[in-house]
A protein has these predicted regions:
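N-terminal pre-domain/capping segments
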Residues: 1-89
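Conserved, mostly hydrophobic/aromatic
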Residues: 37, 99, 144, 180, ...
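Active-site acidic/histidine proton-transfer and metal-coordination neighborhood
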Residues: 80-177
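Non-cysteine beta-strand/loop elements that form the S-adenosyl-L-methionine
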Residues: 98-105, 177-179, 205-216
């Protein structure tokens, strides 16, 4: 297969935050000194009214990136063309710097798990995902950016390491990559592997964006919860990734137990302390298990409310 464009976007976008509804009022009142915002696609593509008005107004003043959680590019179900049409319409209106999602599947037989599930990494899976990425990019009329997921299991029949899989996928399709360094740490801990070895083989030249987030340590495993500050071990990985990507756009995710905007912004700005390379990173603190309830990759906005309504939960 002929290798497609290696053009890399996002090198100079700077430091960004997730656009979360609990911060709408603060953002619209203060227009804070943030370089850019990332919006969860599903939280805005199906909503009119205030959320759509807010993202329009934010997009007039800041670069915005759309980040999806329901493309399910790894599923064996047919691609959801209705979903893609709604995503395309939102992108046409907002004009994001790029559109991203995850190397994962979220459901099968029309049922959505509302989680980002890992794939068996095989040549067959690579062929399958590459064909679907090509279709998505053709449909959207724009390049897709794909993120490495957090994983809580590995497949015994996987034959390709994830960095090599992502490299081959990017070469075949021309898609960009979103390197989530928290996911690297979470997946490596859960699999008993070395996160630095993962980065040794990662195709940094394909990276458009970096993700930072906090996680919940449960003793025997780690859950990607996005509900606390970034751990020292993840900052160490970020320092290396920042240097290796020559300063790719960096985004802090905080989706559960979201503090005020100033706290999130202050956590994001810690990235500046690590931009001179790994030797400047703080020494990692020993991992200690915590007792918090943990939900993997929460989207703390409309999706949980919608699921509660489906279940008939009372508020």
């Amino acid at each position: 297969v002929t290798e497609k464009s290696t053009e890399v976007l996002g090198r100079d976008l700077g430091l960004g935050l997730g656009l979360r509804n609990v911060h709408f009022e603060h953002i619209l009142e203060h227009w804070p000194a943030v370089d850019w915002f990332e919006a969860i696609s599903e939280n805005f593509m199906d909503s009119g009214g205030r959320p759509r008005d807010v993202i329009r107004r934010v997009a007039e003043r800041y670069p915005v990136v759309l980040h999806g959680v329901s493309l399910s590019v790894g599923s064996t179900d047919p691609l959801n063309l209705d979903y893609l049409a709604r995503l395309k319409a939102l992108a046409a209106e907002i004009q994001p710097a790029w559109v991203s999602d995850h190397l994962c599947w979220t459901g099968i037989l029309g049922q959505n798990s509302h989680d980002l599930l890992p794939l068996p990494l095989t040549e067959e899976a690579l062929d399958h995902v590459a064909a679907r990425v090509d279709r998505v990019q053709d449909f959207l009329g724009r390049r897709l950016i794909l993120e490495n997921p957090s994983s809580y299991l590995t497949f015994s029949h996987s034959t390709v390491e994830e960095p090599a899989f992502l490299r081959a996928l990017a070469e075949r399709t021309g898609c960009g990559l979103l390197l989530d360094v928290n996911n690297v740490f979470v997946s490596a801990f859960n699999a008993g592997t070395d996160p630095q070895a993962y980065l040794d083989d990662f195709p940094f030249e394909r990276v458009v964006q970096l993700h930072l987030a906090g996680h919940s340590h449960r003793g025997t495993h780690i859950i990607d919860t996005h509900d606390c500050p970034v751990r020292a071990e993840v900052w160490e990985l970020f320092a290396r990734a920042w240097e290796a990507t020559d300063g790719a756009a960096t985004l802090l995710e905080w989706d559960g137990d979201i503090p005020n905007f100033e706290t999130c912004h202050a956590e994001l700005l810690k990235a500046r302390d690590f931009m001179d390379g790994p030797t400047h990173a703080a020494a990692p603190a020993p991992l200690a298990a915590d007792g918090r309830d943990a939900v993997s990759t929460p989207v703390d906005f409309m999706i949980p409310n919608a699921m509660a309504a489906v279940r008939g939960d009372q508020t």
